[in-house]
């Protein structure tokens, strides 16, 4: 009789006699006076056995013997093809038929159960037959433990024929047992933590909610996918599922760097396996956010092994959902094709498209919902904040890829113009990126330079950037003139008495005149912050220029004292000259400050000719 035991107290299969001695051993012990009357061949090995104990428990052998009698064929020789587990498992099944005890273990229970099903060792022929014994072991031992259920499922992978275990529904039951046990352990761990409170102690293997992750990594991808799907159905935490997916991917795809070398040896088998693994893992992602670094890693691997387009688009969509938290290193995706640019800007462009689509959908949803104004403004502010973060990241990304000589102007401009104007409070970062692109692509003609510089809003450049523009010989003259003109207009506005308080009051008045229209943070909050910052910068510049004018006034007085004989003529000439170069067109009411400021601007332009910087930053 077969023994269901975890202890090796009975005769083990490893200590069984060789097949050539197998039948004679049974004959001397049980049927010492009866010679073997049937020979069964399994995987090329012959077993000389007795019909009586076999037909008493094996329905298949009983049918075979009956058919041989009817056909008057050789009654003493037959072959069992595609026997589950091979000759070793058949030997254990024969031991059971002869009443010899052996050990059923986690490693052999699947093979024995499938062999019993193949031989039709059901209760119809004998009570407590081999199928019933193995089922009892599975239910009472294997399926009650997550770890043992995983081992049983792993043994299903190596069994031949591969689909024989499915006929007994063993993989399905293993999958459900793993999912149920994982959820049970998650619940038990939570309750134990509540009972323990703040008490400290060493964590055992079962105290960690994800201790089983390492065990699942040994599964084949199709079985692993079934386990993860079952865990999601039974309510396992998404964090645990994501952690398991990340660990499985790292273990399964860690040899991807040598993928090209391996594919030459095995005709693409390794690459196909990696592709199937990656696509399956992506399809198992829960709705919760997956860590960005892991998503970018999967995307890089997917590009390398050329995964399906749908898989790449799903990864790009998930990255776009949390693009505001991305780092510059994540965006620098190398190109795998030779002769192209260094970085994959097309992928980044698609990610930006998905991100902007998400922002647009969120804004439309907020408009459709009848929430209070505070809630609407808060949601809009969050969207605008995400846009500003992405704008800063993209400026850094543009500056990083700009020196690449293989990067085309068309792709560079496409990355710039995809973001709206309100995604940047200041254009200093954009100007820096464009300047680096011009420096790395000296062959651009004047028209191409103009089309590139048109994206820079001169009103959103800091004083430092404006000073750099005025001395940058890589820029078209039209760009320099626009910056100088913007500087003059800003100075005129500052000196005419416009202040931040006036802008704020004007904005509030405009809002009060349109009470039915919801104020968009994109149009008010960001613009007010930008204008306040510009006003502070203008005030600082005015103070510096006033100091310079005071110094110039002292120098002028000293010169007039030295040339007292021509003092009146010199003063008259200076007054006329300053009046002619007055930019604002003001009369005497404008004061000496504006006239002297024009002289300072002329001196700045003369300095431009003397020195040209190589780079802004």
From Swiss-Prot:
BTB domain boundaries: 36-106
Alphabetic keyword roster: Phosphoprotein, Ubl conjugation pathway
Signal peptide bounds: none
InterPro entries on file: BTB/POZ_dom, NPH3/RPT2-like, NPH3_dom, SKP1/BTB/POZ_sf
Pfam families: BTB, NPH3
Free-text domain note: The BTB/POZ domain mediates the interaction with some component of ubiquitin ligase complexes.
Protein name: BTB/POZ domain-containing protein At3g08570
Taxonomic lineage from the root: Eukaryota, Viridiplantae, Streptophyta, Embryophyta, Tracheophyta
């Amino acid at each position: 009789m077969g023994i269901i035991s975890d202890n090796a107290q009975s005769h083990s299969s490893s200590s069984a006699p060789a097949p050539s001695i197998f039948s004679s051993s049974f004959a001397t012990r049980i049927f010492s006076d009866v010679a073997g009357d049937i020979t069964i061949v399994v995987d090329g090995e012959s077993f000389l056995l007795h019909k009586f104990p076999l037909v008493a428990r094996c329905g298949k052998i009983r049918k075979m013997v009956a058919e041989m009698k009817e056909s008057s064929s050789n009654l003493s020789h037959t072959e069992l093809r595609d026997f589950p587990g091979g000759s070793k498992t058949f030997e254990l099944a024969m031991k059971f038929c002869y009443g010899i005890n052996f050990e059923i273990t986690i490693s052999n229970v699947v093979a024995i159960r499938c062999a019993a099903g193949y031989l039709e060792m059901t209760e119809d022929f004998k009570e407590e037959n081999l199928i019933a014994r193995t089922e009892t072991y599975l239910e009472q031992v294997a399926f009650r433990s997550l770890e043992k259920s995983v081992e049983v499922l792993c043994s299903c992978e190596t069994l031949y024929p591969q689909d024989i275990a499915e006929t007994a529904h063993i993989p399905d039951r293993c999958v459900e047992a793993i999912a149920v046990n994982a959820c049970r352990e998650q619940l038990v761990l939570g309750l134990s933590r509540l009972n323990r409170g703040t008490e400290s102690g060493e964590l055992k293997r079962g105290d960690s909610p994800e201790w089983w992750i390492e065990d699942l990594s040994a599964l084949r991808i199709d079985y692993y996918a079934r386990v993860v799907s079952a865990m999601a159905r039974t309510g396992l935490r998404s964090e645990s599922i994501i952690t398991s997916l990340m660990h499985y991917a790292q273990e399964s795809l860690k040899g991807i760097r040598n993928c090209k070398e391996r594919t030459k040896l095995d005709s693409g088998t390794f690459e196909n396996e990696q592709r199937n693994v990656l696509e399956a893992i992506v399809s198992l992602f829960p709705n919760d956010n997956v860590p960005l670094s892991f998503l970018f890693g999967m995307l890089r691997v997917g590009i390398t092994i050329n995964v399906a387009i749908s898989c790449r688009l799903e990864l790009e969509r998930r990255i776009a959902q949390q693009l505001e938290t991305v780092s510059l290193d994540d965006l620098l995706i190398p190109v795998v094709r030779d002769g192209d640019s260094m970085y994959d800007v097309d992928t980044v462009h698609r990610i930006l498209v998905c991100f902007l689509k998400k922002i647009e959908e969120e804004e439309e949803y907020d408009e459709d919902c009848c929430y209070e104004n505070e809630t609407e403004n808060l949601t809009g502010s969050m969207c605008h904040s995400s846009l500003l973060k992405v704008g800063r990241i993209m400026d850094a990304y543009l500056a990083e890829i700009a020196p690449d000589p293989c990067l085309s102007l068309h792709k560079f401009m496409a990355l710039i113009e995809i973001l709206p104007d309100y995604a940047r409070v200041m254009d200093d970062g954009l100007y820096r990126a464009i300047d680096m692109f011009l420096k790395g692509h000296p062959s651009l003609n004047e028209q191409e330079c103009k089309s590139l510089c048109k994206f820079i809003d001169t009103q959103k450049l800091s004083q430092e950037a404006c000073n750099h523009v005025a001395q940058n010989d890589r820029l078209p003259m039209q760009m320099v003139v626009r910056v100088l003109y913007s500087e003059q207009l800003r100075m005129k506005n500052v000196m005419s008495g416009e202040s931040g308080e006036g802008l704020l009051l004007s904005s509030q008045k405009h809002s009060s005149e349109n009470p039915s229209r919801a104020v968009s943070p994109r149009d008010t909050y960001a613009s007010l912050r930008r204008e306040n910052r510009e006003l502070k910068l203008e005030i600082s510049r005015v103070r510096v220029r006033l100091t310079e004018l005071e110094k110039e006034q002292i120098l002028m007085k000293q010169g007039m004292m030295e040339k007292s004989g021509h003092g009146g003529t010199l003063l008259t000439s200076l007054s006329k000259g300053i009046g002619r170069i007055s930019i604002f067109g003001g009369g005497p009411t404008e004061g000496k400050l504006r006239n002297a400021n024009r002289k300072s601007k002329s001196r700045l332009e003369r300095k431009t000719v003397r020195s040209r910087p190589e780079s802004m930053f």
